[in-house]
């Protein structure tokens, strides 16, 4: 999924802003208090509409990103000598390019199609008037997933990751080798749009991967894909090892100035 453009109205410090996004990469630059974080939070809330439509996901803060009381624009009131929220509700409108895909289990081939969809959020509940195209897109993914065994195909789910600077210090030391009781979809999207990082869940998954694979509960190669994604995102990493004894990832890193890692 690629967001083509986003319109933000009456949200935090923005009364009206329009952003057209590059399909490959976007860098947000600006002085403090100019709205860099506001734009990122608006994208989180926009994508929260997708998570809300996923019936496979449980409820709770880890699986949602909705408007908060602090998101409303406030103006100074001379009569009350303080800031009060304006009457207009926040509104976030999105145009996105979505890839609908299915994996054919008999041929091991992936077939995809691309279409543009539109939706907007004005409250913490989706409606057909505001998000019908998104609701149909998610319903198609879920139906294909639900009928995977019968039809011999499976769905491709979009990847979401919201990563802010404060997330680096959240939950890092919380890794425990505990038994996972969440569904595959729940583990995939947990904390995707949250301020916290589900480090424990990721570590538990990689720690138990071989055992789960042997029991038929995992797909072959997903552990390598996970580690390759980390190395692709951080080019300095040359090698990753899983230290299950000490509950740690260990990595071999080569800095630009060094000849060897």
Residue ranges and their predicted role:
Residues 244-248:
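Short Gly/Ser/Thr- and Asp/Glu-enriched loop/turn motifs at secondary-structure junctions
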């Amino acid at each position: 999924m690629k967001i083509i453009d986003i319109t933000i109205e009456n949200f935090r410090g923005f009364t009206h802003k329009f952003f057209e996004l590059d399909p490959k990469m976007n860098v947000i630059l600006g002085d403090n208090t100019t709205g860099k974080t506001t734009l990122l939070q608006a994208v989180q809330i926009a994508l929260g509409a997708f998570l809300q439509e996923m019936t496979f996901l449980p409820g709770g803060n880890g699986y949602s990103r909705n408007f908060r009381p602090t998101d409303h624009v406030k103006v100074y009131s001379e009569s009350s000598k303080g800031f009060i929220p304006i009457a207009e509700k926040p509104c976030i409108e999105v145009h996105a390019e979505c890839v609908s895909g299915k994996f054919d289990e008999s041929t091991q081939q992936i077939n995809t199609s691309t279409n543009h969809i539109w939706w907007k959020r004005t409250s913490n509940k989706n409606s057909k008037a505001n998000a019908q195209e998104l609701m149909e897109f998610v319903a198609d993914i879920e139906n294909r997933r639900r009928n995977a065994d019968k039809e011999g195909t499976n769905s491709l789910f979009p990847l979401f990751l919201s990563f802010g600077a404060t997330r680096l210090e959240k939950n890092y030391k919380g890794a425990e080798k505990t038994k996972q009781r969440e569904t595959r979809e729940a583990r995939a999207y947990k904390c995707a749009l949250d301020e916290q990082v589900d480090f424990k869940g990721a570590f538990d998954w990689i720690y138990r991967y071989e055992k789960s694979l042997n029991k038929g509960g995992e797909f072959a190669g997903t552990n390598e894909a996970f580690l390759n994604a980390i190395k692709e995102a951080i080019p300095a990493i040359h090698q990753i090892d899983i230290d299950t004894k000490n509950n740690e990832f260990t990595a071999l890193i080569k800095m630009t100035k060094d000849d060897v890692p």
